[in-house]
Regions:
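Extracytoplasmic
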Residues: 9-43, 61-64
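Residue-level signature of mid-helix packing/kink "hotspots" within the transmembrane helices
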Residues: 26, 54-62, 145-146
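Juxtamembrane helix-start elements in MFS-like secondary transporters
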Residues: 42-50, 134
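Transmembrane alpha-helical segments of major facilitator superfamily
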Residues: 48-57, 141
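Conserved MFS/SLC helix-loop-helix module at the cytosolic interface between two early adjacent transmembrane helices
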Residues: 59-98
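MFS-fold secondary transporters
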Residues: 87-91, 107, 181
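Helix-loop-helix hairpin linking two adjacent transmembrane segments in secondary transporters
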Residues: 99, 128-129, 136-184
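Cytoplasmic helix-loop-helix junction between adjacent transmembrane helices
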Residues: 103-139
């Protein structure tokens, strides 16, 4: 692969990874009532669901360095993006609370791994431009967190699949991040 193509691919990877680091979390709140009604989810379980990101980020974050050392940075990022996209897509179409929670955990594990490894990915591939690429991924992460939270309710009301299509959409975006993650560098 030509050096310029590799550079473009790595920049795309940083942006696509970052765009997927919060949408799966922030898109739930605006449609939580619809999710609860559809899945017959109790208020206690909804509270548990909304506390899962903090718990999963902490637990998976602890083991991520070990996973990265054992499997390598790129393989671990690929696994994270696959878990994230699979979790987001499948959870949207689960018929019950248990499946929804399980696949939320799968997606959150992917996000947690990405949270921990993004600084290492930037340092590995852009050692002379760490502040610039940290700003790029921080901006993309924050922008998508905002965007997903404000568009998910209108999407839910305009899609024939309702809240399921609206939250599953973010899994399709995560699939795009699998592409640069899967190309060996």
């Amino acid at each position: 692969m030509k050096r310029t193509h590799l550079h473009v691919l790595l920049v795309a990877a940083v942006v696509l990874f970052a765009l997927n680091m919060r949408a799966g979390v922030t898109s739930i709140g605006p449609v939580l009532q619809e999710i609860q009604d559809s899945l017959h989810m109790s208020d206690a379980m909804a509270g548990f669901l909304t506390s899962l990101p903090t718990l999963i980020f902490a637990l998976v974050g602890l083991i991520t360095p070990m996973l990265s050392r054992r499997c390598g940075l790129h393989v671990t990022m690929l696994v994270a993006m696959v878990a994230l996209s699979l979790g987001l897509i499948v959870r949207a179409f689960m018929g019950g609370t248990a499946g929804f929670i399980v696949f939320s955990i799968v997606a959150l594990a992917g996000i947690a791994i990405t949270n921990v490894l993004m600084p290492a990915f930037v340092k590995t591939h852009f050692p002379q431009r760490i502040p610039t690429f940290t700003a790029v991924y921080s901006t993309a992460l924050t922008a998508m967190a905002f965007l997903s939270s404000i568009v998910v309710a209108p999407m839910s009301h305009s899609m024939s699949t309702g809240w399921r299509g609206a939250i599953g959409f973010w899994g399709l975006l995560a699939l795009l991040a699998v592409i640069p993650a899967a190309i060996p560098v």
